């Protein structure tokens, strides 16, 4: 929460890459607070002791976590923010790499909670799940990330068919 903020704030759950809550994601979260958001960045590695201090070990640790349990952790974070007394009930999700996929997943799984999602180069949801998305999306892909980008044409087609508001940047 920004020190100078007054009143209820929009909230953002910030989802890290596939290596835990590293200093970069902590800084993104801090900057969102400065910008006037109630921001929360859970560490998926908390059950294993938290981010170990370097990304290589973080990747190794995260590979040991159950994927659905991690997803449930981020769902719980978004639901907590929606009900937080300092928040205004509106919750966005932003994620990077693995976290971009989770931002998409949150938009699918908890559409009554997620008011906006901003995935950075995350995996796309299954086409049949896209109609569940009610939030506008601001999607970012990296030009040379051919693995993730390969899913974009089908995702875009599903977004258009479901009339989901989106903007994509490559």
Predicted regions span which residues?
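Short N-terminal helix/helix-N-cap motif within the alpha/beta-hydrolase-1
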Residues: 22-26, 49, 101, 128, ...
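Short beta-strand/loop motif that positions the catalytic acidic residue
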Residues: 133, 139-141
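Primarily recognizes the serine-hydrolase "nucleophile elbow" in alpha/beta-hydrolase
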Residues: 75-134
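Active-site-adjacent alpha-helix of alpha/beta-hydrolase-fold enzymes
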Residues: 31-34, 143-170
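Serine-hydrolase catalytic machinery in alpha/beta-hydrolase-like enzymes
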Residues: 1-86
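The conserved SAM/SAH-binding core of class I Rossmann-like methyltransferase domains
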Residues: 40-42, 120, 169
